[in-house]
Amino acid sequence: MIKIKMSFVFFLGIVLYSGLLNELSNLFLTILIHEAGHLFFILLFKQKIKSVEFTGFGIFINVSLSTNNILKKLLIFGGGILSNLIFILIIKSRITYDYHKIMIFLNLIPIIPLDGFQMVNVLLSCFYEDEFINDVLFYVGTLILSLLLIFSLIFK
């Protein structure tokens, strides 16, 4: 099921009104390539897609994982990052490189709902309970975001 959130419609309106159609089209293409990486592994491992949501913050594929295989889960959650990395290696455009590099960096941050959180969660679930993992990742994610904010203010 495809869901289009109101925030996505609002985002499209801003894109059309702002005059940044080219830049935001590149961003949207980067997001599509990222999600295609997830989709590739979801279909490869025959997992069930519950929905695809278009929001003002991106696209989210909600999948019902029926596998306990850690490698398969890591490939599904890391598939977006892999597709961005492959795209960087194939396409040598500086603009494209920057968008994909940022997408990779942001998705490696271990905060919900990003890929970094999902991958670390899969790895830690082999050793710890979900509640402990969520608590640890909450504090780690908060620390990382705080450091990013501080660095962005210091090194403008």
Residue ranges of each PLM-predicted region?
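Hydrophobic transmembrane alpha-helices and their immediate loop junctions
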Residues: M1-K156
